[in-house]
Amino acid sequence: MDRDLELTVRDLAEHFKIKGQIISCEPYGGGHINSTFLLACLDENGKQRRYVLQRINQSVFKSPEQVMANIKAVTDYLKPFAEEPRNVLTLIKNQDGKTFYINEKGEYWRIYRFIEDSICLDLPETTEDFYQSAYAFGKFQRDLSNFPADTLYETIPDFHNTPKRYETFLKAVEEDVCGRAASVAEEIKFFKDRKDFYSVLIDNCNKGTLPLRVSHNDTKINNSMLDFKTRKAICVIDLDTIMPGFSVTDFGDAIRFGASTAAEDEKDLSKVWLDMDMFKTYAEGFLDGCGGQLLDSEIMLLPEGAKMMTVECGMRFLTDYLQGDTYFKIHHEGHNLERCHTQMKLVADMEAHWDEMKAIVKKHCKNQQ
């Protein structure tokens, strides 16, 4: 690590109530949003303690203090449910008692206690890994089932407001700033044909059949930590996007990413479909983790959550393609269109297996009528 950067990191860490002297610091993890460093400290008894120092990316999170207020509220609430300290992220306070430090550049920094003896997977190595990740996110819902979700800040407004995303998509089609709309008429029709579906979750929320809950909003497997030895779920991490939302969208985003048989930008669409065994595994893990806290009406909307997150993501890729690839990072011409195609194929496969998806989740309802 660059010597000047190391000195900067060490100086930042001194503003927090970490235990011991810093003996090493190095860049850590593969996250793209925040700059992250792993610190190793040696306390007065010769015990090594490790911490994770992060800079919050203010181009993504416009109100870092709201992000940190959400994280503090949720982690404080979760602590009584933890069987051991590793079961919940632990924020280290700065010397003034706050959960973040602002340096002279106006950057926001925070420190978490490192979760020892754990592994973080980008992809499940076994179906049990996928089950355990699902269980972790389900237990997150169970433990927060009585948390007043409406007290959290909406740090990214309309993040999963699919009707709003559709409005943005229609505007992109109409404006056609890059002259690409004519070449993607079939793709545009695909999303227009499903317009009546986009309000399903909000409509159910308004009816009271889909309660507002704390949603994580980034339920990829690498945001759940597993024990290194037992491979059992330890906890959920990366809480930057926690907001008021729906349990079914957390479930759905995990399915979109984890139960697909191919990468998000796979060009050969014959390789893309919904792995029903993985869907079943995740549903079982998630609902076992929820421990009966979800309403039957919520459980029956889990397939809608999976389809909604997938169709919304595909729509966002196409919107970005129409607008000139200004939001998602692309690696070659047409990359966003390729991503859009995989999501379209996944949606179509979900529709083809709809009755099966519904039957799988119905088995977990309290009322089997």
Language model features with spans:
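Catalytic activation segment of kinase domains across protein kinase-like and atypical kinase folds
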Residues: 222-263
